[in-house]
């Protein structure tokens, strides 16, 4: 459908939407001065996406089901036959169990890729986008930030994201102009028996001295041992901001950054960074170096926790070996800015005036 599997554009492409109904509700919102996105706000975002997709000729959207009320509230709007909510694409929901855990996002991304969607629009923070990328394969994603940490998804009006995605999905912008390559961090933990565990991060992998996962969100900087980033934006919020304010690395630039942290008073210098909205923390920096594509970097810490894109995920012990490897060109995303420039330069949103109705 659309550009899926490299095929030429078809008449009725399908776009997937994965909206995390509970993003931006973790402990970082409690300890910092940050708001949570309400359910009605999420519904309004989806409606704006649908309106933009409809204007591009997308007639069908596939969504992840939920049990938080988003589906019910959205259905009320879609049932209207008049007004701004009329004429929107048909919304179908995946036939899948709902657990209200990250498993839903993983399963939905996998099902949408299997269904041949042209693209997947993701509403969530870094953790939600990471889960989608794990399972979406070659399907490009369009990120929309609705989480606490939003270093990966850029801040944009949903209508514009919907337009860019719709123009690509319907074949009006070719992949060479519409898509961008993104970096990824691969984390591998090998044990003494030859077994291994593997996971990914889109933005940052952080090593903590802690030994229990507990609350998944990581925000206490005095427990940090090392920070690895695929890119580092000095305007970002979250653990990647440490790298962004130390040595910025562009998201399209090759390579990443590895930072070793020290105990208080023992680093080369202290760095103040915004770890969560409204939460400024100081971290002692011991040293840093660039990460090169495809070259594994061995973690020095003997035991602890690996947090991926801000959330504790993996525990390791003294008999384990942990490596972090950066990969350039790991997955594709909709380049919204490039799509909109292409649309303007090639007059994609123009049409001839329709004759006025007589009588």
Curated annotation (Swiss-Prot):
First-listed, main subcellular location of the protein, grouped into a coarse class: membrane
Coiled coil spans: none
Listed GO biological process terms: acetoin catabolic process; NADP biosynthetic process
Keyword RNA-binding in record: no
InterPro entries noted in UniProt: AcoX-like, AcoX_kinase, ATP-NAD_kinase_N, NAD/diacylglycerol_kinase_sf, NADK
GO molecular function: ATP binding; NAD binding; NAD+ kinase activity
GO cellular component: plasma membrane
Listed PANTHER family: ACETOIN CATABOLISM PROTEIN X (PTHR40697:SF3)
Protein name: Acetoin catabolism protein X
